[in-house]
Amino acid sequence: MEIRVIGRGALAGLVAGILGFLFAWIFAEPTIDKAIDYESGRMNVLSTVHTAMGHPVEPDGPELFSRSIQSGIGAATGIIAFSVAMGALVAVAYLVLHGRFQVRPKVLGWTTAGFGFLGVYLLPFVKYPSNPPAVGHEFTMEARGFLYLGMVWGSLTLLGLAVFAARKLSAKVGWARAVGIAVLGFFVLYGGLLAALPSLGDLAANVEHAGEFGFARAATETPQPITNTFDTPVTVDGKVYAPGQLIY
């Protein structure tokens, strides 16, 4: 039985992964391409300005995988593999919880999947939405990754604690009151987690780079338009930009 249930979960994940890749390929990849073009052009302008001012400019690293591979087989492999793994994990969670709650198997299955959706995607998304569509500020990539994973871990932990509390309290106050208390406690702790973690645009690295040319603080990690913040005109590709004028 266990192998069959896990296999069904993995199969459901496979179907979801294929649909997810098709959606990404049709709707998301064009936006990502535009974002990459924007960031590449922005970096070229910054390199030109820094070179003209005599500042050292680091060369671009080698491209390990072409954009066509990234948006094609790379995205397909990543999305489908992740979806299969998530489907199998939901099936394992279902097997662990089966028999511990007096609910029908179908209800338990949908509830387990729903809690997984909340903990892995929706609740972390409230604090750290998926932005930017390309790379964003390179100096915050590592911090963003750790913060997002921390938000996922915190969300799943709080959901687990809420279920545990509701189950323990149900014997004393009944299921309805137990669920109400657990939900209220969850939102209080979840609100504390949202307040405790730093917001995008306010990370330590953002503050550190606040005075650099071409950087502007914003409530996002998408690089902002470049403005001439110097007291003198700046020449880029033969065009002169006055102080305060938008360059790119």
Question: In which residue ranges do the predicted regions lie?
Answer:
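Juxtamembrane/disordered regions of integral membrane proteins
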Residues: M1-Y248
